[in-house]
């Protein structure tokens, strides 16, 4: 079974800090093709901006591998017009893309900052997404 996900930037950052962490496992699943990343140019811009911040000290090669893999495996979508309130306007693009995807398929927004998004069953933490993946393996 394929899962369609929008990965919030904080999930990608956490994954690069520790590939063995739950966010790291989610990123690995995306790069392996079990999880299909849902993308938008604005999301890629955010990934690029945040991952290249000097404070994180990520190896450029690791960033390139992650972003190239997400692009290769991902699907680019338009952003839906939303009526739900998203407290941080910078995060709206993640919610807009998941809402666009949900018009045609089940899709999840995976974030470490649940409070930044409307309370919906498809807005999940990395741990919840991993539970969904493992549950449906059985």
Question: Whereabouts are the PLM-identified features?
Answer:
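Extreme N-terminal starter segment of soluble prokaryotic enzymes
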Residues: 2-4
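PIN/NYN-family metal-dependent endoribonuclease catalytic core
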Residues: 6-7, 17, 22-52
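Acidic catalytic patch
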Residues: 41-44, 62-86
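Membrane interface segments of multi-pass transport proteins and intramembrane proteases
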Residues: 56-57
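Acidic, metal-coordinating catalytic cores used for nucleic-acid/nucleotide bond scission
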Residues: 84-90, 115
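Acidic, metal-associated active-site segment
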Residues: 88-110
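Acidic, PIN/NYN-like endoribonuclease modules and their adjacent C-terminal/linker elements
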Residues: 103-138
